[in-house]
């Protein structure tokens, strides 16, 4: 599952992590890649959002900071039913703000999460970095994320040269209240 939580702000402009946890608990995924997550930031009430969501869902949390924001950290996270053997995150380019790629390693597979830049050149550079980082993996890989790219973009086509699209290619995901763009996907390796 991929979920851009928008620092906990719902469509009613109210911050409510319990609602986000309710969505996750209703679906009961084994893994959730979270984007736009605050960690102890003033703007989100000094709450460690990924830890609170882990508490509310009973899942294991991992956070990958992208940048400092509002006297805290901002980035992406993952929630998993199983504790990973290890994890790593690497910085990705972002013209408007730094971005991150997070991978959780398990004995038989690797689960990754990302949030790509709004800038097409930064997205292409991110794809190259991800491909270079993951080329030595010898087990199945799943990448969730807010990729900020539509299916007809050259970045999407570049991603599909190395990765297989696993999510519904017709599912419009943005904006939440009246989705008309496809920006969020789940990819797997071609092996």
How should each PLM-predicted stretch be described?
Residues 1-56, 68-70:
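N-terminal, active-site-proximal structural segment of metallo-dependent hydrolase catalytic domains
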Residues 30-31, 140-142, 185:
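Short, Asp-centered acidic motifs that coordinate Mg2+ and/or phosphate
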Residues 1, 80-85, 97-113:
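Beta-strand-turn-beta hairpins that frame and shape the catalytic cleft
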Residues 18-23, 52, 103, 128-133, ...:
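Alpha-helical elements of Rossmann-like donor-binding domains used by nucleotide-donor carbohydrate transfer enzymes
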Residues 3-5, 37, 114-116, 145-147:
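Active-site metal-binding loops of divalent metal-dependent hydrolases
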Residues 105-112, 124-147, 154-157:
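His/acidic metal-ligating clusters that form di-metal
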Residues 7-9, 88-92, 113-120:
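Surface-exposed cleft-lining segments at the edges of enzyme active sites
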Residues 13, 45-46, 59-78, 97, ...:
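Active site of divalent-metal-dependent phosphoester/diester hydrolases
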């Amino acid at each position: 599952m991929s979920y851009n939580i928008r620092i906990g702000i719902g469509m009613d402009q109210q911050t409510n992590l319990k609602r986000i946890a309710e969505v996750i608990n209703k679906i009961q995924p084994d893994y959730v890649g979270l984007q736009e997550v605050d960690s102890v930031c003033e703007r989100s009430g000094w709450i460690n959002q990924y830890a609170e969501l882990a508490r509310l869902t009973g899942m294991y949390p991992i956070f990958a900071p992208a940048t400092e924001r509002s006297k805290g950290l901002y980035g992406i996270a993952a929630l998993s039913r199983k504790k990973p053997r290890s994890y790593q995150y690497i910085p990705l380019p972002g013209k408007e703000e730094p971005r991150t790629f997070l991978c959780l390693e398990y004995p038989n597979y690797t689960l990754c999460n990302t949030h790509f830049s709004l800038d097409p050149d930064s997205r292409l550079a991110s794809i190259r970095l991800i491909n270079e980082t993951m080329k030595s993996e010898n087990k199945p890989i799943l990448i969730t994320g807010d990729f900020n790219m539509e299916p007809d973009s050259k970045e999407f086509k570049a991603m599909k040269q190395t990765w297989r699209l696993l999510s519904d290619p017709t599912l419009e995901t943005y904006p939440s209240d009246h989705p008309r763009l496809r920006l969020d996907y789940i990819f797997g390796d071609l092996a």
